[in-house]
């Protein structure tokens, strides 16, 4: 189905810079997210028909569409995030490519281009309307496409009371891209039987398995002396960082793994001879494998300290989120419903693990099973990001189908 306000709504949203800041200590991490929620989303939530609309100190804008059929007793939530990834989000100037011809798309005057030779996903979209960047910023389809889709679904349901639906709760939240947005999510206040994050990629994605995730911060303490007299005295902290890294499995890196394979990912190294720091993320799907990866890093640190004769390597591990499969497999209703709705709409469900995490990873462990459904974005987090309007329309269809489902 087509929705006349969907494109303009999306274009309005992406032009607002809501980039999150991993170094911030506030919630939300940036004032722009607060302003977007209170000045743009809250008024529009009320306009499209949501009731009891409010903004919480945790950064979530919340609203409710009451059920219009007493036989539909479920309460279902839909959640999308306001923030965008760590890439330029100022001056977003989207291009709308109608009836895409399957060829190369020049991204404004930036010199960058979307070429099917480089981005095979483009082969799915001839004849469709694509929204791209102008090459100078990301687009923000992750996850403003989800916000626009949820808002449009509510608008349509309000205008069409003949479509009977259950109670719907909507939540637009902050800071998903920096991994902390759901930390303060109020599951008791949201009060639904299950929910969906509308934060996936291409048409048909339906996901209930995520990585389990941890962060590792390493400190290496060296001893700096003049290199001319260093023998037997110098301890080079940078060399310690290299030695540590070289003891990790060389093939367990993001660029060499896929599917259900986990990895260690070196994110950052800084330092000097005297002192160095390294930051890693650890990812795996199975709990035992996840725990083994953390234990392996600790074992390497302990072994190095033993060989050095002093505690020069310090490792701090922090769990970030867990595979929501552990929760959702106990009651597959949200998957069964979404799968049935997609199939009724002629959409082939693509059920595969997320090689990442969503807000649903944390919210599921708060007591609300929250799988992820497609929102349409491709090549997310950079200048090559784009989305199909037709996929966004199908996401709206899916949301409407889920809340009207009687099975």
UniProtKB/Swiss-Prot annotation:
GO terms for biological process: peptide catabolic process; proteolysis. Zn(2+) 1 binds at residues 81, 142, 199. Keywords: Aminopeptidase, Cytoplasm, Hydrolase, Metal-binding, Metalloprotease, Protease, Zinc. It comes from the Bacteria. Pfam families: M20_dimer, Peptidase_M20. GO terms for cellular component: cytosol. GO terms for molecular function: metallopeptidase activity; tripeptide aminopeptidase activity; zinc ion binding. Its EC number is 3.4.11.4. Binds 2 Zn(2+) ions per subunit. Its cofactor is Zn(2+). The keyword Metal-binding applies. It catalyses: Release of the N-terminal residue from a tripeptide. It is found in: Cytoplasm. InterPro entries: ArgE/DapE_CS, Bact_exopeptidase_dim_dom, Peptidase_M20, Peptidase_M20_dimer, Peptidase_M20B. The keyword Zinc applies. Its main location: cytoplasm. Cleaves the N-terminal amino acid of tripeptides. This is Peptidase T.
């Amino acid at each position: 189905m087509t929705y006349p306000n969907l494109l303009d709504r999306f274009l309005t949203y992406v032009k607002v810079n809501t980039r999150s800041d991993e170094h911030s200590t506030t919630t939300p991490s940036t004032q722009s997210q607060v302003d977007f929620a209170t000045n743009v989303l809250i008024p529009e939530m009320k306009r499209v028909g949501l009731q009891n609309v409010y903004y919480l100190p945790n950064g979530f804008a919340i609203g409710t569409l009451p059920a219009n059929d007493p036989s539909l007793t479920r309460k279902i939530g839909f959640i999308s995030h306001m923030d965008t990834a760590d890439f330029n989000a100022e001056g977003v100037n989207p291009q709308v490519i109608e009836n895409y011809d399957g060829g190369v798309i020049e991204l404004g005057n930036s010199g960058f281009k979307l070429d099917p030779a480089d981005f095979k996903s483009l082969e799915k979209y001839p004849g469709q309307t694509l929204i791209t960047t102008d090459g100078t910023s990301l687009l923000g389809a992750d996850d403003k496409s989800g916000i626009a889709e949820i808002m449009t679904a509510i608008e349509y349901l309000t205008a069409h009371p003949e479509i009977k639906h259950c109670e719907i709760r909507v939540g637009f939240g902050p800071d998903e891209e920096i991994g902390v947005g759901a930390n303060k999510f109020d599951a008791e206040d949201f009060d639904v039987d299950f929910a969906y994050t509308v934060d996936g990629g291409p048409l048909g994605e339906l996901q209930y398995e995520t990585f389990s995730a941890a962060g590792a911060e390493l400190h290496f303490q060296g001893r700096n002396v003049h290199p001319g007299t260093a023998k037997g005295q110098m301890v080079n902290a940078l060399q310690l960082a290299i030695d540590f890294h070289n003891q990790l499995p060389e093939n367990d890196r993001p660029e060499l793994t896929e599917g259900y394979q986990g990895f260690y990912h070196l994110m950052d190294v800084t330092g000097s001879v005297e002192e160095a720091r390294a930051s890693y993320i650890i990812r795996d799907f199975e709990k035992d494998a996840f725990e083994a990866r953390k234990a392996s890093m600790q074992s390497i640190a302990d072994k190095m300290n033993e060989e050095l004769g002093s505690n020069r390597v310090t490792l701090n591990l922090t769990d970030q989120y867990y595979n929501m499969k552990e929760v959702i497999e106990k009651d597959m209703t949200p998957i069964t419903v979404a799968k049935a709705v997609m199939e009724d709409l002629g959409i082939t469900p693509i059920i595969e693990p997320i090689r990442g995490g969503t807000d649903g990873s944390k919210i599921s462990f708060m007591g609300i099973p929250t799988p992820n459904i497609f929102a349409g974005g491709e090549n997310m987090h950079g200048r090559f990001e784009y989305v199909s309007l037709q996929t966004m329309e199908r996401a709206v269809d899916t949301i409407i189908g889920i809340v009207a489902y009687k099975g």
